[in-house]
């Protein structure tokens, strides 16, 4: 039907309904803009935070050049290694009066030890006397340790004098009465073309003619021992000092952190704790096998420090860090990841890293053939921490420590 002439048909418009969607385009625009601002701000903050890390990772040089090495899977802590709390039965002695009594020697009831502030002290009853100092003050800090000196291994010789291994200054003989100090081997002297960098422990033959000692590294000093462990540098040596000719000879080299040393009963060989490798080697220093080396015990449940004779004819081995199984061992995990070691040492100091090492203390008694006899534990290091040596005397075990501010005494009849 045609529209009437002169009239126009108008289509009705739908009423305009106002809703919340009316301003949606404007809201979306605002939201998009705010999101962009947020993302840009977030990315800027992330970049700002990551930039120093990237500089550390790609620009800064790591202080260590780690070597790849492998450790066997740690032994299960069962049987002889079964965890217990026996070290918690120990008594702390001279708390806050002795810092870092690493090694111990005794003449009768009188004990001698070296401390973190460079002193060699004499312990009589409840009294501590400073017997001698080898280095020069100031002492007591990492910065001055290399000039102050750090007495580590200590032994009583057949003539009643003390033989002392100072990490920075060398080998010394000390009169236990007068405190007179005599230098035997200086670290200034080159041995087979290399200086002594980290003199650690020693032992003396029964006739006093030979002193065997360990030089843990020619690259790293004692104050950087974590660098040595992490780098796994194989530059440690076992040396022999002849008290008559004054000559020093290399008995064995290319060891990874040779630490504690103990003469075998026949004195034709010495046991050497190879700390980084969690084992004890036997180095032949005289006789038909001189110059040879074999393994006394492999794959220990911890990292061995000093070795000392036990009254049963075996050996006490102190370990300040363990390789728990079941459990997690940081050093085992990192052994085949040198890139991660480098990164860690770019980011953290040695003191910071030590905080991540469990305070688990462990002392193991081994038979003369290396078989485990028994073990004493303090899993959290609540009483005995950072154990470096177990020294047996008169039915008691005296526990030295490279770091703790005390000495521990354990009654063996009660454990």
Curated annotation (Swiss-Prot):
Q: Which InterPro entries match?
A: 6-blade_b-propeller_TolB-like, Strictosidine_synth_cons-reg
Q: Does the keyword Transmembrane apply?
A: yes
- Keyword Membrane present in the record's keywords: the answer is yes
Name any one Pfam family assigned in the record: Str_synth
**Which sequence ranges are listed under topological domain Extracellular?**
61-412
Q: GO cellular component annotations, sorted alphabetically? A: membrane
Give the molecular function GO annotations. arylesterase activity
- UniProt similarity note: Belongs to the strictosidine synthase family.
Q: What protein name does the entry list?
A: Adipocyte plasma membrane-associated protein
Q: Which gene encodes it?
A: apmap
